[in-house]
Amino acid sequence: MERGPVVGAGLGAGARIQALLGCLLKVLLWVASALLYFGSEQAARLLGSPCLRRLYHAWLAAVVIFGPLLQFHVNPRTIFASHGNFFNIKFVNSAWGWTCTFLGGFVLLVVFLATRRVAVTARHLSRLVVGAAVWRGAGRAFLLIEDLTGSCFEPLPQGLLLHELPDRRSCLAAGHQWRGYTVSSHTFLLTFCCLLMAEEAAVFAKYLAHGLPAGAPLRLVFLLNVLLLGLWNFLLLCTVIYFHQYTHKVVGAAVGTFAWYLTYGSWYHQPWSPGSPGHGLFPRPHSSRKHN
């Protein structure tokens, strides 16, 4: 006869626990939303500052020029010194794929939410197509330079024996080594991706300033791009410290910077180009009429 109150008390305790968990979940969601809002606002403000972007360009130059000096002050046996480390295989070797995936989603959301026009969205996304062409073209050019400047060597216990094989393909087919001037494609790609992502992400500050819709999904995609940009900076530093010869890294970074300048610094400002980031997205202030 006394089981009824006990069961009722148990159900009441369960309901209270469920309500408590519901309240806790709401608090956690509120905290996550607040952090997402605050983090995206601050990151947009930093990336949207022209002065800070110029300092960022100076930072990249300093990393490539002076970063190799750190090789004398770091542990050569660290995981980042291995060509087979996780970040090198999963991220650096596929840096353009990661950049296109994250940045493509950001550009798609920003442009379409700002204009609601498919044609304008496609035009802005075409910058990534140009970037892919730049990456493919640079890779082929680097291989051509290596072919034109190289020679074929056979590794022997006493050293290297020079062979007269005419090109890299026949040299490698014979089981030998082809040694030429190798421009660092990783340094080129990471430098190009860093400059490109910083340029594209800077638009978010204007987007927010114009009061355009900026829900949690868009802010999350933006912050993911910021995190990827930070990762590219870190991996660029690791690359210049642990891998490649000094001039190979400097030339790779210089070519990446030049490719960015030709596209974002010059061509994209022309009317027959894909357009610069933010072009045509925001209403211009009405200019005052001139009186005669």
Curated annotation (Swiss-Prot):
Subcellular location, principal: endoplasmic reticulum
TM ranges: 19-39, 55-75, 95-115, 142-162, 188-208, 221-241, 250-270
Disulphide connectivity of cysteines: none
Membrane topology, Lumenal segments: 1-18, 76-94, 163-187, 242-249
Catalytic-site annotation from UniProt: H186, H244
Cytoplasmic side: 40-54, 116-141, 209-220, 271-292
Keywords: Endoplasmic reticulum, Lipid metabolism, Membrane, Transmembrane, Transmembrane helix
Cited function: Plays an important role in the formation of lipid droplets (LDs) which are storage organelles at the center of lipid and energy homeostasis. Directly binds to diacylglycerol (DAGs) and triacylglycerol.
Full protein name: Fat storage-inducing transmembrane protein 1
Source species: Homo sapiens
Protein encoded by which gene: FITM1
